[in-house]
Amino acid sequence: MGRKIVVALGGNAILSKDASAAAQQQALMDTAKHLVKFIENGDQLIISHGNGPQVGNLLLQQSAGSTEENPAMPLDTAVAMTQGSIGYWMQNAMNQVLKEKGLNKTVATVVTQVEVSADDPAFTNPTKPIGPFMSKDEADLAKKENPDFTFVEDAGRGYRRVVPSPKPIGVVETDAVNTLVDAGIVPISVGGGGIPVVADGNQLLGREAVIDKDFASEKLAELVGADALIILTAVPNIYVNFNKPNQKKLEHVSVNDLETYISEKQFAPGSMLPKVQAAIDFVKATGNEAVVTALDNIEGFVNEGSGTVITKKVRQQA
């Protein structure tokens, strides 16, 4: 039996410039054609995904249509709603591609709650970007209409709303995910970072936050005993001195070296930094490898090991 692998999809795997349902379903069909490479390779696949654009758009719709009789849903419920919609699109796309390939596998979405601490400092310091990019004028108008919202500039690409992003400390449905994997089913889990909940006695109480999907994927990978965590993004490798004349591609890199690069502020917060931090956390917790690469490099990774591979120590080159 192949390796158990958690693959975390980036937003570009779901959403193009067209935010319609049809366009997102088509994007996921293209994504599924790449992901099936793992199954063809004999790997046990667990899929996770982000929801930043989708949950932000949903909140805008909720806010615009909110009335006393039909109030807007809170953020934790909006996360659950996007888990359902994206999971529906993803499992249909995967099941179609699996049938076309003659592979006897099926895919199922797990509505997943992720436990966080009620005392997490993130609740008083919102940093997680969600929703569409806006111009400064658009962000100022949205702030005027929604005084409780916070907007910041995101990696030089425009302004976005930011919300609390607490760190995951547990995944409630871990056993359900493992049961599906053991039954030969491909689970989709911790969508959008999971629904943030805090434990209160026998209750799990939702919180208005969005957990970073890379940290949630790392926690899931750790808890299910994954052999590898693969974080997909828009570029095939992690780079230092990114977009500078002395840009350097990282292929095999140690945790210690990555931590040095973090101290040098090589990675943009809210962009590459959480992916690197999640990869480090997984390698430290398990001793197994983490990989950061692009969706369209999956075949290259499966066949040749290309991408950025993070291990405790740098491998000796042959």
From Swiss-Prot:
InterPro entries: AceGlu_kinase-like_sf, Asp/Glu/Uridylate_kinase, Carb_kinase
Biochemical pathway: Metabolic intermediate metabolism; carbamoyl phosphate degradation; CO(2) and NH(3) from carbamoyl phosphate: step 1/1
Gene3D superfamilies per the UniProt record, alphabetical: Acetylglutamate kinase-like
GO CC annotation terms, alphabetical: cytosol
Record keywords, A-Z: Arginine metabolism, ATP-binding, Cytoplasm, Kinase, Nucleotide-binding, Transferase
Its EC number(s): 2.7.2.2
GO MF terms, alphabetically ordered: ATP binding; carbamate kinase activity
GO biological process: arginine deiminase pathway
Disulfide bond annotation, renumbered to this chain: none
Segments passing through the bilayer: none
Places the protein is found: Cytoplasm
Reactions this protein catalyses: hydrogencarbonate + NH4(+) + ATP = carbamoyl phosphate + ADP + H2O + H(+)
CDD domains on file: AAK_CK
Pfam families in UniProt: AA_kinase (PF00696)
Family: Belongs to the carbamate kinase family.
Protein name per its UniProtKB record: Carbamate kinase
Organism: Lentilactobacillus hilgardii (Lactobacillus hilgardii)
